[in-house]
Swiss-Prot record:
Organism classification: Bacteria, Bacillati, Bacillota, Bacilli, Lactobacillales
Main location: cytoplasm
Protein species of origin: Limosilactobacillus reuteri (strain DSM 20016)
UniProt xrefs under Gene3D superfamilies: 1.10.150.870, 3.30.1900.20, 6.10.140.1510, Metal-dependent hydrolases, Nucleic acid-binding proteins, PolC, middle finger domain, Ribonuclease H-like superfamily/Ribonuclease H
Gene this chain is encoded by: polC
S-S pairs: none
GO CC annotations on file: cytoplasm
Name of the protein this chain belongs to: DNA polymerase III PolC-type
Exonuclease domain segment(s): 426-582
Single biological process term from Gene Ontology: DNA-templated DNA replication
Reaction catalyzed: DNA(n) + a 2'-deoxyribonucleoside 5'-triphosphate = DNA(n+1) + diphosphate
Function: Required for replicative DNA synthesis. This DNA polymerase also exhibits 3' to 5' exonuclease activity.
Length: 1443
């Protein structure tokens, strides 16, 4: 008897190795039929289920089915069910799969559908689409296919009804997405609760916790047989039934599914390629194992390779996952015989190295190396991190830099004498060679012309037979072939002829030092001595005479000075062109600089920024002592500020001046000693080496680019050069040391550097050759690299001498100070105390209320004891000056948590508990039990003693949120100045502390994730490679964090104490190497010296500018505006107080254009909460800035009636004050607040204490969802400004709109605005209809048009620009209208606008022609103004009047 249909299905599950055979969804499942198409090898499986499978299960089953029959046929699946009701969640879950399956042949519709999702309501399936075009195309081409695809997967028949949301289609789509995400989160929470219940009986009052990680190594599924072949990932190119791979995990993520199960996804690499791996959990044990899988571990994985429809890539579906031990590279040398790496680049070497000093030093420490150096290109920005890792690991850090050094000037003439230059006979010569090395390469052509007064007297042109065939590269560069030189005269013959040719003449050439090197080497080889005649180099001569030229190549100069050069890179043509140029140059030099004699030339070799034109060479510089570190900081600063040209440069004389306490090494192949040895020979290298303290040689692979370019002929020549470098050190008795020039950690990291260098294109010379192997080598690897020197010598260079250099450097050098060094302000402590106590007594009476007395003493004790008085006094001076100059200052951050800041005039926010105080008799009454959240919410009340209306104040903010519980945290006083006033405030710091003591806070910009991903894609394109998505992720990860540029904090000002200088803390530079910048910045990222030197944040903000504009327009003092005005408060619930309806302004509140409360997101919050007073607005401000605070937290609590806007957690300080009001200890309350605001949750023991204090469960649950929170003082300051502005909006509307459009608006549609509300509404509709396709400029304009529409609906008008009245930038009030400024005209910039006004003030414009000429207005703008009747009173041209 055959198998039943149900049994056939069971057999099918076994055949495809499906892991979830017992899933309840398979109950009664059966095989209805299998239709086999033999010719096309396609099998259709017709299956029966009770209902459509949960999507996650369907995906897993479908993939297993496809893989199970991969080698037999292509499989399709059709499902039948008795299902009659629609399941909304299932339809949504399947949506993406269905769309990709059904309409992949119409990409536009496919993309449009993937951006939305269907909804089911009362059995009707609807779909929001963006526009009518999409709707029509769906009906014509797609809906039937989509509906049919659903039915083939077991869904009942249904129709999809598309519709267009006319008001905000894109917003609707986003809302749908958010709804589904919320549903996912809710299901995930239920799943977590179920897991908790099954695993252990815990206290019901506690929140469900995630499954705890399992003990021991990871093992999911079975142990993978060690005999099973591990496949390299690069060899997997298609789907496979089963593979075993092993690799390093670099990304891991666990996702809760709606089914209650978990999906583990991780990315793994074996460094040949990478894969994404997926595994669905089957039970809580597996989920405990999932929690153990983290980035950084090594795993072995077995499972099928399948094309994943979601990821659109090959993915491994793991059956078995085993943690394995990976044996990394080890330094096998004895512990007392390890090397020290003295040449290491970190991520601070701009776009050139891929590992941080932390990673490099940690590896060195792990290998047992006693020390490691940091030597980045031209900067020391890794020093703070280097110091930190040295402190943690105990490894000795050697602080250095690979500098770009230049000779101060290149000689204009060699072998100078006192001969006259005029009327001399000159021999201008040029050589063509087989390469760049005078030692290893040969001259193959020597050409010269003898000239006098610009006329050619005689020519010399000889080929030289080098004795070997010419390389293809030589022929390509010189156009000289082997046949041309074969049989020519010998070098000795030609050189002797040339020597005779030059007698009695002055010699010259272009870049002649190169040619002289070959000639002198050849002369000496044949015992002719060196060239004795004066030799003029036209290259530095041209640079001196014409410093502003962009290039000085011979062809460039010939073109500029109209000198014929027919065959560049042929010696005879080059020589004659150079001769004609020399004649012109010498005449110019005499006329401009009175250069008449040969020895006059070198008097000018350092002029006209000669350092810019010298070719930089690399020098390794180490700080040997603390004094040396300061000198190094000075050199870095000078190189960035005084001598920057393309790269930071250090002139040799400057290096010599600051050499005390420094050790100098010869660096890499770009060092002058190695270059001299390679190109000019031992003697010249010897002379240059005398300048250095130690000689560096590097592994042969480091020099591979020189071999590739044929600069060094072969490995034999390279070994000769390196042996001579060693010999040179021995002769000079200088230490010769083997260094690695490390740019990355391990060999497989080299590709990250290739990607970074590739991203810079042809501009980077490193792109012209293959990159050498410059990983961090172990002692034994390094010894092996230098084995050609012999075992003893290799050990000396690699181990003995590297340790010797390290020992010569002091052990206790500190690049970062160990404490704070605030600036000095005489009497600061006393002044802050006096100001505080005096104001306190003025406000609260004498004696002070105990509460006020205690709070002030608490704060002043911390401030004075920890040396923070000067911080406060600087802030007080800045605020006082700004206020005096007519600009209010808003505080940011937590400074409003300090009553000392309030009483000394730094902030308007009062952190004391809500209270009344009488301004007449100083009667006070405080509310300390949480009765009120803000003093601004208190009802108006007269003093019970004297009858004066009392001041209402206090926001109940603990001081601890500012300076920490112990009051010793360095204060970060952030102040919001008007954007107009910010530069004045910045420069005032120079007035207070002196020009040399004030700097901008520097920043370092590194490669971000998205940028790195772009680099990877570019690398794929340029190298014609294609990587899997997981491999792209790995490569992008490897390229992130590398320094790209530098910048400056927009507000941070660093202040140096007057008894120190900036070099005690950091070098300085210009931001982004911009030599025209107004301020120098710290070279170190300011975060790294935050605890050592004072930084003031003097920010620019629109709110104070707006307040000043409102005050100027109205004459009303903004500080007199009440904070509880009923009309103003009504704005936050309805626009009625403005005299308009919701429909008229398309908003349910009246807060359009109000800072903090005008965005769509916050207006939605207002609609949900209907705030009635200041403290509730303060809550809104906190909720809108936090993360994990509003969405799926406070919003739900309010909607469900569990809490109100008044008592949900809005700001971080609420937590501390709330818990104290519940009766908890203040220190524990503070610690809980700190944990929660940083997203760290609440430890179990603290949760116990919260339960004991009867803190509600909803409150604790809310805390556990929070990731980041806003400071209450910050929110209080922002709301204060917002309410002042709102007051003008309600009661002085035209003043408000005038200020808003003048201060906060940059984008206008002045035509629509001047044509009235219908035109404005039409323009708004046009932008809204574009949805996400609207440009950023259009989205900004939409915000402005919303305000314009509101103003028009309130009965006011806009007027087009008025040529006689309009301001350049500000809108003007004219009756019930606003006149547009000139900058509102499209395409008319602010500079032209100012020019128009300035010209008009001189005299009225007579005509359009006059406007164009004096106003600098283009014809396009004239046409616009004409079309819009702005110029109706002006004729086209000026007209003369006879009478």
């Amino acid at each position: 008897m055959g198998l039943s249909r149900q049994e056939l299905f069971g057999k099918l599950l076994e055949q495809i190795h499906f892991p979830e055979k017992d899933n309840s969804a398979f109950r009664n499942a059966a095989v209805q039929s299998v239709v086999v198409h033999k010719k096309s090898r396609q099998w259709e499986f017709h299956l029966i289920f009770n209902k459509a499978l949960p999507y996650d299960l369907f995906t897993q089953f479908n993939q297993s089915l496809q893989l199970g029959f991969k080698d037999i046929a292509k499989v399709s699946l059709k499902i039948s069910t008795p299902m009659t009701e629609l399941d909304e969640s299932q339809i949504a879950n399947y949506w993406q799969f269905i769309i990709n399956k059904a309409i992949s042949d119409t990409p536009m519709l496919q993309q449009a559908c993937l951006q939305t999702a269907p909804e089911v309501k009362d059995g009707r399936v609807t779909l929001v689409v963006e526009n009518e075009v999409i709707k029509d195309l769906l009906a014509q081409k797609a809906l039937d296919k989509i509906e049919k695809s659903y039915q083939e997967l077991g869904f009942p028949k249904f129709r999809i009804h598309p519709f267009v949301d006319q008001s905000a289609s894109q917003a609707k789509i986003e809302e749908l997405k958010a709804k589904h995400e919320k549903a996912d989160a809710a299901l995930a929470a239920k799943a977590a609760a179920r897991i908790k219940k099954n695993e252990a009986a815990k206290k019901t009052a506690k929140k469900s916790a995630p499954v705890a990680p399992a003990d021991g190594p990871v093992q999911l599924g079975r142990m993978i047989d060690s005999k099973q072949n591990v496949i390299q990932m690069k060899d997997i190119e298609g789907e496979e039934r089963s593979v075993v791979v092993e690799g390093y995990v670099f990304n891991a993520e666990i996702r809760e599914l709606r089914s209650g199960r978990q999906l583990l996804t991780f990315e793994i690499t074996d460094y040949t390629s990478s894969f994404s791996v997926k595994k669905f959990s089957r039970n809580s044990d597996e989920e405990a194992q999932f929690a153990n899988i983290k980035a950084g571990m090594w795993l072995k994985v077995r499972g099928p390779v399948q094309e994943d429809t979601w990821m659109r890539d090959l993915v491994i579906t793991a059956y078995d996952v085993n943690e394995v031990t990976h044996i990394a590279r080890q330094d096998k040398a004895p512990q007392d015989d390890k090397r020290v790496e003295l040449h290491t680049h970190t991520t601070m070497s701009q776009m050139d190295a891929t590992n941080s000093i932390t990673e490099l030093a940690t590896r060195a420490h792990k290998w047992g190396h006693p020390a490691i150096a940091v030597t980045d290109h031209g900067n020391v920005q890794a020093f703070p991190e280097a110091f930190s890792v040295a402190q943690k690991t105990g490894i000795k850090m050697l602080y250095g830099m690979e500098a770009n050094v230049v000779d101060d000037g290149i000689p204009l003439v060699y072998n100078e004498n006192h001969e006259e230059l005029a009327h001399q006979t000159y021999v201008i010569f040029d050589v063509e060679t087989t390469g760049l090395s005078a030692i290893y390469d040969k001259v193959i052509e020597l050409s010269a012309v003898k000239m006098q007064d610009g006329n050619v007297l005689e020519r010399f042109d000889e080929f030289i037979d080098p004795g070997f065939p010419l390389s293809e590269q030589t022929t390509n560069l010189t156009s000289i072939t082997t046949e041309m030189v074969q049989g020519s005269k010998t070098e000795e013959e030609v050189f002797q002829m040339f020597k005779d040719f030059c007698k009695g003449c002055i010699i010259a050439g272009h870049n002649v030092s190169f040619d002289m090197g070959f000639m002198n080497t050849g002369y000496e080889r044949h015992q002719m001595g060196k060239i004795a005649e004066p030799v003029i180099d036209t290259l530095p001569l041209a640079r001196f005479l014409y410093p502003d030229m962009r290039g000085y190549r011979l062809n460039t100069l010939s073109k500029k000075f109209k000198v014929a050069l027919e065959h560049h890179h042929r010696a005879n043509y080059d020589s004659e062109a150079t001769g004609h140029l020399l004649y012109k140059f010498l005449k110019d030099a005499e006329a401009r600089y009175d250069v008449k004699y040969v020895d006059d030339l070198n008097k000018h070799m350092e002029e006209n920024n000669a350092y810019r034109h010298a070719r930089p060479f690399h020098v390794t510089i180490f700080a040997q002592t603390q004094a040396g570190l300061k000198n190094l900081f000075k050199l870095v600063s000078l190189s960035n500020v005084e001598y920057f040209y393309r790269v930071p440069r250090i002139p040799r004389t400057v290096l010599t001046k600051y050499r005390e306490g420094l050790l100098l090494g010869t660096a890499c192949s770009s060092g002058e000693v190695f270059t001299a040895m390679m190109e000019k020979g031992y003697d010249q290298a010897l002379e240059k080496a005398r300048y250095y303290d130690f000689i560096e040689v590097q592994p042969k692979p480091n020099y591979a680019p020189l071999l590739e370019q044929h600069v060094i002929a072969d490995e034999g020549h390279l070994e000769d050069i390196l042996k001579n470098m060693v010999k040179l050190g021995d002769e000079l008795e200088k230490t010769v040391v083997a260094t690695g020039d490390v740019h990355y950690l391990d060999p497989h990291d080299g590709i990250y550097r290739k990607i970074l260098i590739n991203s810079q294109g042809g501009a980077n010379p490193l792109n012209r050759t293959e990159r050498p192997e410059v990983h961090f080598r172990t002692t034994d690897e390094m010894l092996n690299e230098f084995a050609f020197l012999g075992e003893e010598k290799a050990h000396e260079l690699v181990v003995e001498n590297s340790n010797k250099i390290a020992a010569e450097i002091d052990d206790n050098i500190r690049p970062v100070k160990d404490k704070l060094y605030p600036p000095h302000m005489k009497g600061a402590e006393q002044e802050i105390q006096d100001r505080t106590w005096n104001t306190a007594r003025k406000w609260y009476g004498d004696p002070l209320p105990q509460l006020v007395q205690d709070r002030i003493e608490l704060e002043l004790n911390s401030i004075v004891k920890n040396g923070f008085s000067v911080h406060y006094l600087i802030a007080q001076r800045l605020v006082a000056k700004s206020n005096k100059d007519g600009y209010l200052v808003g505080s940011r951050g937590s400074v409003g948590s300090s009553v000392v800041a309030t009483l000394s005039g730094i902030t308007e926010v009062n952190p004391l508990p809500p209270h009344y105080r009488c301004p007449n008799c100083q009667f006070t009454h405080f509310y300390t039990q949480g009765e009120y959240s803000s003093g601004f919410d208190l009802p108006d009340k007269k003093c019970p003693k004297c009858g004066t209306l009392m001041v209402k104040d206090g926001h109940d903010i603990p001081f601890q949120t500012f300076l920490g519980f112990k009051g010793n945290k360095v204060p970060d006083i952030d102040l919001n100045f008007s954007g107009d006033y910010q530069p004045i405030a910045h420069n005032y710091m120079k007035v207070l502390f002196g020009e040399k003591n004030v700097f901008r806070a520097g920043t370092i910009g590194t490669v971000a994730d998205k940028t790195a991903y772009g680099y990877v894609k570019a690398y794929e394109r340029d190298t014609e490679k294609e990587f899997r998505k997981a491999e792209e992720d790995r490569l992008a990860k490897g390229a992130t964090g590398v320094k790209r540029t530098t910048g400056q904090h927009p507000a941070g000002i660093i202040i140096v104490p007057d008894d120190m200088d900036i070099y005690d803390f950091t070098p300085v530079q210009y931001p982004a190497d911009d030599q025209t910048a107004a301020w120098e910045t710290t070279h170190f990222d300011f975060h790294s010296i935050h605890d050592n030197i004072l930084k003031m944040d003097i920010l620019g903000h629109d709110d104070p500018t707006m307040i000043r504009a409102l005050q100027d327009l109205s004459g009303i003092d903004p500080q007199s505006i009440p904070m509880d005005d009923p009309g103003v408060m009504a704005l936050f619930s309805s626009p009625k107080v403005l005299g308009v309806t919701e429909e008229q302004i398309q908003s349910k509140t009246g807060t359009l254009g109000l800072p903090e409360f005008g965005t769509r997101f916050v207006r939605g919050m207002l609609e949900d909460t209907h705030p009635k007073n200041y403290s509730q607005l303060l809550q809104i401000s906190g909720l809108s800035h936090g993360t994990g605070v509003w969405l799926d937290n406070a919003q739900e609590l309010i909607k469900q009636g569990i809490a109100t806007i008044a008592n949900v957690i809005g700001c971080r300080d609420n937590i501390m004050t709330d818990l104290i009001h519940y009766g908890m200890d203040s220190e524990i309350s503070f610690q809980i607040m700190e944990h929660v605001r940083k997203g760290r949750g609440i430890p179990d023991e603290w949760q116990e204490k919260m339960h004991e204090a009867n803190v509600p469960q909803w409150y604790m649950d809310s805390c556990l969802k929070i990731k980041y929170m806003f400071p209450r003082a910050h929110a209080a300051a922002y709301v204060l400004m917002a309410l002042r502005i709102a007051y003008f909006k309600v009661y002085f509307p035209l003043v408000y709109y005038c200020a808003f459009f003048s201060v906060r608006a940059d984008d206008f549609d002045v035509v629509a605005m001047s044509h009235g509300k219908d035109a404005v509404k039409q323009r708004m509709k046009e932008i809204n209809d574009k949805g996400n396709d609207a440009s950023a400029k259009e989205k900004n304009l939409l915000t402005i048009l919303e305000l314009a529409n509101e103003m028009l609906e309130r009965g006011f008008k806009f007027k087009m620009v008025d040529i006689e009245k309009s301001d350049a930038s500000d809108w003007l009030i004219d009756g019930d209208s606003l006149i547009a400024p000139f900058r509102a005209v499209p395409g008319l910039g602010l500079n032209v606008a100012k020019q128009i006004v300035a010209a008009r003030e001189e005299r009225p414009f007579l005509s359009k022609e006059d406007l164009a000429e004096r106003g600098k207005v283009s014809q396009t703008l004239i046409d616009f103004l004409t079309d819009n009747h702005v110029l109706d009173k002006l004729p086209d041209e000026n007209q003369l009047s006879l009478f």
